[in-house]
Amino acid sequence: MSTTLLWFSSVIGYVIQTKCLSNIQSKKEISVGPNGTIATPETNGDNGNSSSLTFYLTFMYFASWLLLVPASRLWEKMRPMFVSDSDSNRNSQFDNNNSGSVTNEDVDTFSHVLDDPQPRIPAQQQKQKIISVATFKYVAKLTVLALIMIVADLTYNMALSLSPAFDVALMQNTAIFEIVTLLYGVCGISRKNYVFRNFLIMMNAVIGILIISYTKATCDMLAGKLSVNPNTGELSDPFLFDRLKGALICGLGALIMGPFAVLWNRWFCSNISKNENSAVVLVKQSTHMALIGIIGMVILLPFIPKFPSRESVESISLFYNDKSFWFSLLGSIIFGSLPSLISILELNRKAPAEYLTTCNLGAIIFMGLAEWVCEPTQTTIVRWEVIGYIMLTVSLLVLSVTLGEGKYHH
């Protein structure tokens, strides 16, 4: 599949995931009968319940990573339907010459666990192979990445419970774009071509984001979401401090994705050959992600929120019995998280590492379009907001061309 289709898949998947999770977090009442409703645990505000839904959504997000392995194997079988002729010839040549070679030492550590060993080795030798220095190093790497993802995803879900989906997407993707671009340059992962020109284009993109965020309050006021105090002339926003807190939490939590991106490329992408079968690489990296998900769930288990009252347990049970909750959750996983993660893994192999930062700019643009499509009567567009989107789109197109040069760089 081309990098363009993978790019759209990752961006649209992120938008679907964010909109679905925001729909769950913003739900204030649950229908319990023909005419009856009950407040959600988040609305009740009992001690221990204010973050219970955020915690469970984070836990379920890590659980969805277990589906990456079967999804990648399904993609491996369906891949001949989508690859181009050049990709097919390159992969067939590799299969004939190097089908048995594996260059990733960390995957070799668990190769006898993930696949059937050929030939089979005695149980004692297999046990000694599992308990080795390489195994502990591999588990330590996965644990570090799992801890980073726990912080990033908890802050992401917490921000969605406080702020609208667009505000969260704007803050998170801006922070990730800036920190990843900075660390890729400092750590020598990104290329040194056209550095000053790319810097000017990135500054233009950041200015466009600034204009969009600055005019957002004006758009909300014209749409009736905000009002003006007639006595003071100031905007009256009852959720102002929640929005500010959500933006701060999301922005700071997203910064940790910079070290995650650097460590992932150092540990699991540096040894990938451009001639290695992409389907095999995808299965290996999906296995890494699934193991990170398992470790993340294990770390989260001791911190399961406790409900202080019987009413809290009943409201949680009713919430999970609500069909819209499961439809939104399954939609965020099947049409959001899985396609986005698989596309990001493929893009990270096919294109230069810094090319992935364009997905963050695209997510902001498509999130704005999704808000306009889903809420046309509550969305008002002003001239300066359009100018901001134009600046951001032009920067995205130029960066996609300049950063996307040199495919199959690994």
From Swiss-Prot:
The subcellular localization recorded is: Endoplasmic reticulum membrane
Q: Which residues lie on this side of the membrane: Cytoplasmic?
A: 72-141, 188-197, 266-285, 345-355, 405-410
Disulphide-bridged cysteine pairs? none
Query: What does it do?
Result: Required for calcium regulation. May regulate calcium accumulation by a non-vacuole organelle. Also regulates the activity of CSH1 and SUR1 during mannosyl phosphorylinositol ceramide synthesis.
* Membrane topology summary: Multi-pass membrane protein
Task: Outline the subunit composition.
Answer: Heterodimer of CSH1 and CSG2, and SUR1 and CSG2.
Q: Among its keywords, does the record have Transmembrane helix?
A: yes
Which range is the signal sequence, renumbered to this chain?
A: 1-17
> Which organism's genome codes for this protein?
Saccharomyces cerevisiae (strain ATCC 204508 / S288c) (Baker's yeast)
**Record GO terms (molecular function):** enzyme regulator activity; intracellularly gated calcium channel activity
Q: What keywords are annotated for this sequence in UniProt? A: Endoplasmic reticulum, Glycoprotein, Membrane, Signal, Transmembrane, Transmembrane helix
Q: Which residues are glycosylated?
A: 35, 49
Residue intervals passing through the bilayer: 51-71, 142-161, 168-187, 198-217, 246-265, 286-305, 325-344, 356-374, 386-404
One GO cellular component this record assigns the protein to is: endoplasmic reticulum membrane
State which ranges are Lumenal (membrane side).
18-50, 162-167, 218-245, 306-324, 375-385
Q: Could you tell me the Gene Ontology terms of the biological process aspect for this record?
A: endoplasmic reticulum calcium ion homeostasis; glycosphingolipid biosynthetic process; intracellular calcium ion homeostasis; mannosyl diphosphorylinositol ceramide metabolic process; release of sequestered calcium ion into cytosol by endoplasmic reticulum
What name does the UniProt record give this protein? Mannosyl phosphorylinositol ceramide synthase regulatory protein CSG2
Q: Which Pfam family is one of those matched by this entry?
A: CSG2
Tell me, in one coarse class, where this protein mainly resides: endoplasmic reticulum
